[in-house]
Amino acid sequence: MKKRIALLPGDGIGPEVLESATDVLKSVAERFNHEFEFEYGLIGGAAIDEHHNPLPEETVAACKNADAILLGAVGGPKWDQNPSELRPEKGLLSIRKQLDLFANLRPVKVFESLSDASPLKKEYIDNVDFVIVRELTGGLYFGQPSKRYVNTEGEQEAVDTLFYKRTEIERVIREGFKMAAARKGKVTSVDKANVLESSRLWREVAEDVAQEFPDVKLEHMLVDNAAMQLIYAPNQFDVVVTENMFGDILSDEASMLTGSLGMLPSASLSSSGLHLFEPVHGSAPDIAGKGMANPFAAILSAAMLLRTSFGLEEEAKAVEDAVNKVLASGKRTRDLARSEEFSSTQAITEEVKAAIMSENTISNV
């Protein structure tokens, strides 16, 4: 198989973890006899510094010319005082909008060998395996008007708009039901229908879409209760589907069940089939260039890319099995280590690559 992958390193530790993921993809290509071509593009602060634009047209063109996109991380305090249109995060929001990346998938799974890294007791996180499906291109982050101004009495005011079309809600909820139908058959739709009109519409649409999936159970949950239930009984969930801001907050909360943001991959899906994959963690500029970054989330994002964009199930599982093998051996990055001893980003990457190349599967026995 020959495929083209757009690589967007971004800022902070983004280039380091993306290099790890790329090296792993090269090992997969070697072992399974594929050909992956890579094209780099700038995004976020790196693009602002070079082009005075968080998402240059060249980057968009490179993405549209690719079969899949792999991103590192964006942001950092260096650009915190920039106007909103010149903030690194604007690049991420813009690429989501331009490529119509409407649904973000965040798998939350606790690795057995990392159960001691979770802040929750083991009995609370046993069998935790769910996916948060977050709407990405609507809601409070994109609604208009969104501005600050001075009113007629000279006082500063600000307004943001939570706006959704029925079609925007419908397609992301349907994606959640499709996933649940292939998993454990349960969708938890999270909203704030006791207060917000947009959430009342969300709940109505969820009920309508549920009629298409008679074998999938639908439950509604208010967002404040969902935040509590993620800690109280996280193993009750299968697929959680919610709007943009709620999903942003809940997915970060859920990430701590695993013990580190550095373990969680994500995928952003488009209706065209051009999907973007990225680790959930941020750019962590304080450890950039020190070899301390955890590459597992980026590597697992590459596994999601292989499975979701290319349909390469065996190859994706080889990567995931390699990660499991390295973790089971006791190797830890700094964020996961329970002592002063830890492995560097590069050392972990080499361990994963070696595990991929050494595994015996039907295809290469």
From Swiss-Prot:
Pfam families on file: Iso_dh (PF00180)
Reaction equation(s) it catalyzes: (2R,3S)-3-isopropylmalate + NAD(+) = 4-methyl-2-oxopentanoate + CO2 + NADH
Disulfides per UniProt: none
Key words of the record: Amino-acid biosynthesis, Branched-chain amino acid biosynthesis, Cytoplasm, Leucine biosynthesis, Magnesium, Manganese, Metal-binding, NAD, Oxidoreductase
UniProt enzyme class: oxidoreductase
GO CC annotation terms, alphabetical: cytosol
Cofactor(s), names only, from the UniProt record: Mg(2+); Mn(2+)
Positions bound to NAD(+): 76-89, 282-294
InterPro entries in the record: IsoCit/isopropylmalate_DH_CS, IsoPropMal-DH-like_dom, Isopropylmalate_DH
Subunit structure and binding partners: Homodimer.
Family to which this protein belongs: Belongs to the isocitrate and isopropylmalate dehydrogenases family. LeuB type 1 subfamily.
Name the UniProt record assigns to this protein: 3-isopropylmalate dehydrogenase
Chain's gene name: leuB
